[in-house]
Regions:
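Long, compositionally biased, glycine/small-hydrophobic-enriched stretches that function as flexible linkers
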Residues: 1-198, 202-213, 373-523, 527-540, ...
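Residue-level detector of anion-binding/catalytic polar loops
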Residues: 272, 337, 400
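Catalytic or ion-translocation cores adjacent to nucleophile or general acid/base/metal-coordination motifs
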Residues: 205-229, 233, 239-240, 246-249, ...
Length: 672
């Protein structure tokens, strides 16, 4: 397809002439069939909802086709309307546009749906089993058409994948405002998502899937690396040297969109990592992309390979293509010493493809979850109980186990596993409680990211160099409390190119605090203005950040004043970003830990070398981080109190309400 044909297809939106119905493509990974949850009347409603995208003259053709999709897959994806062109992030000038900001958003959307990047690309699922960009291909086509037409005086409003329309606004307003899964709280159970999504009225956007900000496994790679690195240091009782990390064994599960970062992170940290993945498609994709070194499908071969690698203190990553419970039970039976353990199965979505029970094949599980969901639920919970039993045996021998924010502890507790101690608390910490919260989030460090819209590796190399120079300059005057974090982050960005992290767009992830993000972004803007970077850069972050997410079992699990179940921070954050210069903003229900368990939001900002971009950087990035530090400070988190005091000294006009600490004895004596 020529560039002109591609641009014409984008501008056309939903085509005037129905495209040919193509055969089901078995070359890519597909979402499992969803449970049959709709009543007969609701199925009729789902069809009416789907057909309203199309002229009446096509209803007789499309109605039986969509009804068959609903019967076969549990959803209406509108496969007929999947574009003929290849899906990937093109250079920004390839997109037909009147607004350069809108062209940047088109690039980001296509990256989220790139088969090299997305988990189930034909079902518009980017990661996590159900993290959707859109609900169907009609929505995709309409959105791309609107983006190609809009000006910088309009805003596109997105309701859970559905483009409500272009509304008049102004150049400093966001070009797109996204909401995903915003349901009334009393109707936010997992089955409510199943029903609403099958009806075509809501979707689960995960975090960066529905907000057009996913950058492949690299997006979680830096966070996973510093988590593994600092978990290893906790085991060693030292944070001064990496020598003792060599030969440590790290065991986990998942090679999907987020979990797929684990083996690469293990390599960067210098450990032996073993990650189980039941889906051969996912394991082979990560191996082909260089994110895992070895594939093993036989435990009798894997166990000796693990022993040998540990004895030789090699840095190597191994994937076990099989069920994680089989792996944990075998490690426990063989009494292999595991240093670090975690889990990244998609337990935010345990009954619909996020967790596969032991003793069943992938295909058997996919069939049962749709045909007999109650029995499947029992098998999942039995499997979780067995997994926890094996993990408990290994932790009794010295393994440090941490929950990686995927609802493992929560779902294990609900399954009746031996996961709660005598004090009523979980046996194991969340990684945010032990590592990410007190060491990073409380000081404002989080997953800042950028995408070079030229698509040129040379531009990415330039941004890496600029970011390293900025960080090194900040490091010279950094307070002692954050020197270790700065050193790890500088090392990451200097090694990023060599570690071959790019999958999809020319993107980079870098943990940085408010000062670092603003100064790096300002330096990028200057470099674009001077022509050192050839095209605009999109700035963003994961929602998994200092201010973006209220999640009591992950991002805010180290909030102990009782407000961990409140979502004021995430809501205030997206509102504040929207009028301080974000190009697009999003707010979601459920990213990471699951539907009804989380509120999370994010942003994207296209910078083009202009003074407007410089102002947006100054105003928005400051708020986007310090909102969360202020909230964490009010919760009496020591690191945040230090960080916010420092920020108030640095920034005129910034004044935060500080907590007054109370003596424990004073309170305790009143209740004796």
């Amino acid at each position: 397809m020529t560039l002109a044909e591609f641009q014409a297809d984008i501008r056309a939106g939903i085509p005037e002439i129905l495209p040919e119905l193509r055969p089901y493509d078995h070359s890519v990974s597909h979402a499992p069939k969803r449970k049959d949850i709709l009543t007969p009347e609701e199925k009729k409603l789902a069809l009416r909802n789907a057909l309203r995208y199309f002229p009446k003259k096509y209803h007789a053709t499309l109605a039986p086709e969509f009804a068959e999709e609903l019967r076969t897959y549990g959803r209406i994806y509108m496969y007929r309307f999947r574009p003929q062109y290849d899906m990937y992030a093109r250079p920004i000038e390839d997109y037909p546009h009147k607004s350069l900001q809108a062209a940047g958003i088109m690039l980001m959307i296509q990256n989220n749906l790139d088969p090299a990047v997305a988990q189930h690309p034909h079902e518009l699922i980017t990661y996590g089993g159900n993290g959707a960009v859109f609900q169907n291909w009609a929505q995709y086509r309409l959105v791309m058409k609107y983006l190609s037409e809009m000006t910088d005086e309009q805003t596109l409003v997105m309701y859970s994948g559905h483009p409500l329309g272009l509304f008049p606004s102004h150049k400093n307003a966001p070009r797109v405002v996204v909401t995903n899964g915003m349901v009334i709280p009393n109707y936010s159970k997992p089955d409510d998502w199943e029903r609403d999504n099958a009806l075509g009225v809501s979707q689960y956007g995960q975090m960066t899937a529905g907000s057009y900000m996913y950058i492949g496994p690299q997006g979680i790679g830096h966070g996973t690396t510093i988590t593994v690195l600092n978990a290893a240091r906790k085991q060693m009782g030292s944070n001064k040297s990496q020598d003792g990390i060599k030969g440590m064994l790290f065991v986990s599960s998942g090679l999907g969109g987020m979990s797929g970062a684990q083996p690469k992170a293990g390599n960067i940290a210098g450990v032996v990592s073993v990650v189980a993945e039941i889906n051969p498609h996912a394991a082979e994709k990560r191996h082909a992309q260089g994110w895992v070194d070895e594939l093993h499908s036989d435990l009798d071969e894997l166990i000796p390979a693990i022993r040998k690698a540990v004895a030789e203190k090699r840095t190597v990553s191994m994937a076990y293509v099989g069920n994680v419970v089989d792996l944990w039970e075998r490690l426990a039976a063989e009494e292999i010493h595991v240093d670090l353990g975690s889990d990244q199965t998609s337990l935010h979505n345990p009954w619909a493809g996020g967790y596969y029970p032991v003793g069943m094949t992938l295909e058997e599980s996919n069939d049962m979850m749709a045909a007999d969901p109650d029995q499947f639920r029992e098998r999942v919970q039995e499997s979780l109980r067995r997994q926890v039993t094996a993990i408990n045996k290994l932790t009794s021998k010295g393994m440090y186990f941490f929950d990686y924010g995927n609802a493992f502890l929560l779902q294990s507790q609900r399954a009746g596993a031996d996961i709660v101690g005598s004090d009523g608390k979980f046996r194991y910490p969340s990684y945010v409680q032990d590592i990410m919260g007190p060491m990073f989030f409380d000081y404002g460090f989080g997953p800042f990211r950028w995408v070079c819209t030229s698509g040129a590796p040379k531009d990415l190399e330039t941004t890496d160099r600029i970011a390293a120079e900025v960080m090194e300059k900040i490091r010279q005057e950094a307070p002692e409390e954050i020197v270790g974090q700065m050193d790890d982050n500088i090392h990451w960005i200097k090694e990023a190119g060599r570690n071959r992290l790019v999958v999809g767009s020319q993107a980079r992830i870098l943990y940085a605090d408010a000062e670092g993000r603003a100064k790096i972004a300002a330096a990028f803007n200057d470099a674009i203005k001077k022509g050192e970077i050839s095209k605009p850069v999109v700035l963003g972050r994961d929602h998994h950040d200092v201010s973006g997410t209220d999640s009591p079992f992950r991002e805010t699990s180290n909030i102990y004043d009782g407000s961990q179940f409140c979502a004021d921070m995430a809501i205030q954050n997206v509102i504040g970003d929207s009028f301080r210069g974000a190009t697009w903003v999003s707010i979601h229900n459920g990213g990471g830990v699951g539907w009804g368990e989380v509120i999370n939001g994010g942003f994207g900002m296209l910078i083009d070398g202009s003074e407007d971009s410089a102002r947006h950087i100054r105003e928005m990035l400051f708020w986007d981080v310090n909102n969360g530090i202020a909230r964490r400070s009010w919760a009496r988190n020591e690191g945040s109190m230090h960080a916010i005091e420092r920020e108030m000294q640095r920034t005129p006009g910034f004044k935060v309400t500080m907590p007054n600490l109370v003596e424990d004895d004073l309170i305790n004596n009143l209740f004796n």
